[in-house]
Amino acid sequence: MFSDYASRFLAQSRFSSVDQRNFKYPTSRSNLQSVSIDRNSSIDSHETDLSAGSSSLHGLNSLIDSGSIHWQLREQEQSNSHISRNENELFSKENSIYNGNFSENLGVQPNPQTISHESVNEEYTELPYDAHLPSEQKVPDRKWGLTFGFLTLALFTYSFLMVWRTNPNIPPATSPYAAIQKAFPLFHKDAIICMMLSVIWLFCLVAIPRFLYFLLASVPLTMFAFAVYLLKASRIHLETSIQPKLMLLTGIILLVAPILLSYYVWRRRIHFETSFNIIRLACRVIADIPQITLIFISFLFSFYVLIFIWVRLFARLFLRGSTLVGSVWVLPRSSWVLASFYSLHFLWLCTFFHALQCAIISSIVSQWFFYRDTKSSATKTNLVSHFFYHVVSNQYGLCAFSSFLVVITKVPLHFLPTWLRHVSRIVYYMFSKTSASYVTSPLTLAYASIYSVPYMNASKALYQIEQLNRVGLRRRSYYFSKYTLLAARSLLAIGVGVTSWNYSIHENGVFYGYIVGLLGGFLAWLIIGAIEGGLSMIVDALLICSIIDISSCQGDPNGSHCFEAWQLFESNGY
């Protein structure tokens, strides 16, 4: 009995001494120093009481049998834990006062009205709300959602008026309208094939662990095969057509791309295992919540319907105000200007649907990440339907604003020279005080949808996070996993575009076959994006939830809600 007491007392004394040695008190903080003095005095008083109790009894055996030792140890442990909690609270409040960020109203979610550039870090460490608990319904960026709705309604109204006023039987077979109309059966076949391949691809990722290695190895080989195919097809002799030259140029690009891709993969071969494990963790989320596949399939069919409605309306533009000169169909400049506006709005519309999908998936992943072990009577189907309704009804403005910023910021930067990109980023930073890379990042939309805050506030929050250093992040496993998923999407889009282009040349005319190829590739890009993009959205949401979790548990893996995510993102430096 005495040995048990002695070992327990020595262990507790050693733990207390180690804790006191490791705890560093700030020299300029009087509150914490007073707490330290009170703690030492309370420990001394407990030791005095223990020695007094020992001397007052008649023997060691009676002291041990009385049970006072156990009572005193429990009292000391409770008092020490209470003092530790007070110290932590005082330390956090004093830090907030010292930094000028202290606020009396501490909520679970960031306040979209009071969030500022200086206080985003403290609000970022708070966990998102539980979907099973009642919460305040907020509609961030509502005016942008209404603006997007009015513009879409106006554009479709004009399109239906144009359909009513134009005659599809006038143009000859060499017009763009005739080429697009003849390619519609091919588009339907390509869309069905893309949907089947995307579903099979997702099933293989979830069911076959080593499928990613096969996918990464097949990308350069398939691109090389497409390059040889285009170089061979460019030998056809077509007068008054630039398509052989375009085929030759595209074939050369596809011939050089596998070499650059192989070099990039070889230099980052050390990130193979970590990046593949990140994708496997995303597949685990799908396996735990299989209802996410219903979100994927619903957006898959939404893109399918949207594309074919828009393509038919877009083809009607080439009937507007046209005149026939000989056998050539001449288009006025206004038709090309309207076609440009149609293309930009369609790009905004597709990005809006993509943002809706990202917001829904990010909310579901955050619920799985933080509350998957919480007992609740709600089923997973109810959870998915709740977030679907919440995003569609309350976050449509957020999705509209984020998609608008992506279209006007990210798309032009891809076509500008390098020096103009730097100049545009500087000008953008002068007006928004935030880097353009954070404004167009999918991580910003994931954070904004999880906390239901305005989009610009979310970009400011991410701008303050040290873990998201954009310079170092591009060299890490997170981006390699994203590029692996993007490679599969690009491969299918290139394949569909090349086959549509070649089919249009040999079967339906030669003058505007490249338009058919571009539409076919864009069709495949959007359809496979509903699956591949959804998996990439899960990876983004896991990264955001991991950063929130790491900030809330102060980097301690024992306090993490998902140890696998902490091991993949924090221990490997993302």
Swiss-Prot record:
Underlying gene: ctl1
Keyword Transport appears in the UniProt entry: yes
Subunit structure: Interacts with atg9.
Domain of life: Eukaryota
GO MF term list: choline transmembrane transporter activity; transmembrane transporter activity
Chain positions carrying an annotated carbohydrate: 40, 101, 457, 558
Job description of the protein: Required for the normal organization of the preautophagosomal structure (PAS) and for the correct subcellular location of atg9.
GO cellular component, one term: phagophore assembly site membrane
Signal peptide as annotated in the record: none
GO BP terms in the entry: macroautophagy; protein transport; transmembrane transport
Keyword Zinc-finger: no
Protein name, per record: Choline transporter-like protein ctl1
Family: Belongs to the CTL (choline transporter-like) family.
Membrane topology: Multi-pass membrane protein
Keywords: Autophagy, Endoplasmic reticulum, Glycoprotein, Membrane, Protein transport, Transmembrane, Transmembrane helix, Transport
Chain ranges passing through the membrane: 144-164, 189-209, 211-231, 246-266, 291-311, 336-356, 396-416, 434-456, 485-505, 511-531
Pfam families: Choline_transpo (PF04515)
Effect of disrupting the coding gene: Impairs atg8-processing.
Localization in the cell: Endoplasmic reticulum membrane; Preautophagosomal structure membrane
